[in-house]
Structures are given as structure tokens and as C-alpha cells.
Amino acid sequence: MKWLHASFWVPYEGTEYPTVSKAQAAISAYCQKNGHTCRFLGDDQVEIDGVLHEIYRGYEPGSRGSYGIKCRKLP
């Protein structure tokens, strides 16, 4: 699949800062639900459909202090 966006937010319903394991579980669930393959290359990197992404875990802008998980395509 060709990625149209350089980054995307992964659904995360937790109220606490997402740990590495929570982030990886959320990304795995997102990929499975949307028909993508994923392979984790470390705590902060994931390969989705053969495209390398950086994993951001932190505040989601505009969410009134909620935490989020963002995958950003790496060059």
C-alpha cells in the first residue's frame, strides 16, 4: 500500500502516558484492523507495509492534554 500521509495518529484510549508495550499493542491492532503488516524494529521504530516509521508517544495537540501515539514516515 502506498502511504499518502507523512504521519498519522493511532487510536489510543488510555489516560496514562503510553508505554512502549501499550504503543506497540495499539499500532499492531491498528495495522491488523486496516489490513497492514507491521514489524517493530525497536522501541521507537516500526515498519508498516515495508515503510519505516518513527513512533511518537506523548501529548496529542488539540486534545486538551490527552496522550496519543503517532507514526511518522522516515526518509
Annotate each PLM feature.
Residues 1-25, 29, 33:
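Terminal, regulation- and interaction-focused segments at domain boundaries
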Residues 12-13, 42, 69-73:
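Compositionally biased, intrinsically disordered low-complexity regions enriched
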Residues 43-49:
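Short linear loop/turn motifs
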Residues 29, 39, 60-62:
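Sterically constrained small-residue positions within well-ordered secondary structures
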Residues 36-42:
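Short, well-structured beta-strand/strand-turn elements
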